Design a protein with these regions (language model features):
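Short amphipathic alpha-helical coupling segments at ligand-binding clamshell hinges
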Residues: 17-21, 67
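Short, well-ordered beta-strand segments in beta-rich or mixed alpha/beta enzyme
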Residues: 2-9, 39-69
Length: 100
């Protein structure tokens, strides 16, 4: 199991529009081979209300990097969401063999 973690800094004042677009984009990722689950969390710290954390579980790293990112659905995902970000998200992948 792989956990993709993305810190999303949304343009201030665009949070509601981003959340609406995210709901439209969610089915695009959910149909991907190897997709397991996702959750979107909003930062609670004062002054950081425009920051979100996206966590996506994949069966394998390649399901995200080779599968989803090279799919037609990813193009739709980009069109719906990427214009909300500044700066562009930091995306990292974590494996089950991590310490803990």
């Amino acid at each position: 199991m792989i956990l993709e973690s993305a810190r999303l800094d949304v343009l201030p004042g665009q949070e509601d529009a981003f959340l609406a677009a995210f709901e439209q984009a969610r089915p695009l990722i959910a149909v991907q081979p190897g997709f397991v689950s996702l959750r979107l969390l909003r930062c609670l710290d004062p002054g950081s209300e425009s920051r979100f954390l996206l966590q996506v579980e994949w069966e394998r790293l390649e399901d995200h990097t080779e599968g989803f990112r090279k799919s037609a659905e990813y193009q739709g995902w980009r069109e719906l969401l990427h214009h909300f970000y500044s700066p562009f998200p930091l995306v990292e992948h974590f494996g089950s063999d991590s310490l803990g």
